[in-house]
Amino acid sequence: MADEDLLKGVRRLEWARTHMGLLREVRRKLKKERVFEGLRVGMALHVEAKTGILALTIREAGAKVRLASCNPLSTDDSVSLALKEEFGLEVFARKWESREEYYGNLNSVLDLEPDFLIDDGGDLIFLVHTERKELLDSVKGANEETTTGIIRLRAMASSGDLMFPVISINDAHMKYLFDNRYGTGQSTMDGIMTSTNLLIAGKRFVVAGYGWCGRGIAMRARGMGAHVIVTEVDAVRAVEAKMDGFQVMPMMEAAGNADFIVSATGCKDVFTSEHIDAVKDGCILANAGHFDNEISKDALVKASKGIEKVREFVDRYDLSNGKSVYLLGEGRLINLVAGQGHPVEIMDMSFSLQALALRYLSQNHQSLENRVYDVAREIDEEVANMKLETLGVRIDKLTESQRRYLTDWTSGT
């Protein structure tokens, strides 16, 4: 069985490497520049094939790397095994980790005494600032992958508690326009369909949150024939959802007729005790946000007279009011708990940003303040141009006359 899992993991890594042409070019550049030689890099990301290729890329460019999962349920055990046994990478991760295992594995990564961190959700960075403060002198900076982590880190920076510079990969154009929208949209639907084997067409499909992730989910659900309803707390995004052709209403109203409710907000208590009495019997609840607090499991447990696992990633909550609801993947990231995460080509772009931003950090950390920075525009454009090249797409360039026009305020009617 172990041999089968090892072969499965190796094949998944090879498939990912084959289809990650951008990262292959980035690896070539980094090996030539030798900028990572002697560095120690601690990583907390979803441990699956695409992440494995990023970790191997950074190691092949000269760094010593340790990798843990950023979510207790998102590890692909076959890939984790292959990274350790076939490629000799130091990996501390397994699927279905307990809370103690999860934080123990993060601490194992930090035992490397890393120079730089690559995080997803902010737990690794948070740990350095709380239980592992002795590392604040050695950690020179970090990259953060996702919306939820950036929300936490901006709060830390605004309160003066962030003690090293962090680059927000999430806010790069080549990340959120593609990873958050197309990646989350496709992979969330994949996770829902894999876990339930139910039809999407004709169903009432509620998407909580109309940020880039919510946009992607709503777009894909509509494309599969669902009647999509959006819930929001932001008036601007609500107007946008309405103009995009979706119904918009409060969650209390939407829950009563929902066949599916998917949360993608980055905030807690999106679906909680006040919604349980209103929810439609048989409704399926799923989370596409990083943490498992968007759908309140405590509220579901308190309102239930019984809980039963009915499929591998599906728990039925029999409510005291006589209704039942189904929670997918224990309320954690459904696209990684039940699916394989974002498409390979999407993560090729995001992880190329990660590697190039790490290069930028390693070369510029001494001049950076302890706050959250956007990815440098030249890095965003470098990845975009590489992607166009792999797609065989050519675009126009501004002429010198056009450049002068765009910078000349005297030009008018």
Question: Language model features by range: what are they?
Answer:
Residues 43-51, 71-75, 122-124, 212:
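Gly/Ser/Thr-rich loops at beta-strand to alpha-helix junctions
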Residues 110-111, 200, 254-256, 276-280:
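A short, aliphatic-rich alpha-helical micro-motif
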Residues 45-62, 179, 183-258, 263-268:
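Glycine-rich phosphate/diphosphate-binding loop of Rossmann-like nucleotide-binding domains
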Residues 5-22, 36-40, 48, 69, ...:
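Adenosine-phosphate binding glycine-rich loop
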Residues 63-76, 229-231:
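Short internal beta-strands
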Residues 2-36, 69-203:
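Glycine/serine-rich phosphate-binding loop and adjoining beta1-alpha1 elements at the start
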Residues 69, 116-121, 132-148, 267, ...:
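ADP-ribose/adenylate-binding Rossmann-like module
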